[in-house]
Amino acid sequence: MTKPLTKGEIVLFALRKAGIASEATNIDVEPQSFEEGINDLEDLMAELQITFGDLGYQFSAEEENPTSDDASGLPRKYKQVMGYQLMLRMLSDYGIEPTPRQEASAAAAYDALLTDTLSVPSIARRGDMPVGQGNNYTALGTASYYVERGFHAKNTDPVS
């Protein structure tokens, strides 16, 4: 069984991709920025719930503050999507302009989320389709443009 994706993992991903914190460059994460990142994640997920509906994210209770060890409830495949979207928000908090590469990565991840959550409607015909004159398979009466079935016009032209 895979380890559940935590809120702290998403925030660390966003901080790392933004270049704000990284273990490779020994830049430690400030506790205040980490806490703000988790709160930003909660806000981001509330906004994404409007567009995508329920993705399975587990919001923290109103009485308690979210922590980094809380399970997010999201599948692991959404780590990059949420991380890149959170990264864009965090960069604006720090007054840093995102690079075109960061914006392209965030857009590609968001498009992947759109594709993954897309629900294709059934292509079967509806039962309440209107049947017009052209779709009517029974022949119309003599007062109509079409002749009745079984009626064969005889040659009434006197010349032939």
From Swiss-Prot:
Which organism is this entry from? Answer: Acyrthosiphon pisum secondary endosymbiont phage 1
Summarizing the function annotation, the protein's role is: Component of the cylindrical core that assembles on the inner surface of the capsid during procapsid formation. Required for stabilization of the condensed DNA within the capsid; perhaps by plugging the hole through which the DNA enters. Plays a role in ejection of the bacteriophage DNA into the host cell at the initiation of infection. Functions as an exolysin that catalyzes the cleavage of the glycosidic bonds between N-acetylmuramic acid and N-acetylglucosamine residues in peptidoglycans.
One BP term from GO = symbiont genome ejection through host cell envelope, short tail mechanism
What are the UniProt keywords, alphabetically? Degradation of host cell envelope components during virus entry, Degradation of host peptidoglycans during virus entry, Hydrolase, Late protein, Viral genome ejection through host cell envelope, Viral penetration into host cytoplasm, Viral short tail ejection system, Virion, Virus entry into host cell
Q: Does the keyword Hydrolase apply?
A: yes
Entry's Gene Ontology cellular component terms: virion component
Task: Report the Pfam families cross-referenced here.
Answer: P22_Tail-4
> In which domain of life is the source organism classified?
Viruses
- Cellular location(s): Virion
Predominant place of localization: virion
**UniProt record similarity statement:** To phage P22 gp4.
Task: Write the signal peptide boundaries.
Answer: none
Q: Which cysteine pairs are covalently linked by disulfides here?
A: none
Protein name stated in the entry: Peptidoglycan hydrolase gp27
What GO MF terms are annotated?
Answer: hydrolase activity
Matching InterPro entries, A to Z? Gp4_sf, Tail_accessory_Gp4
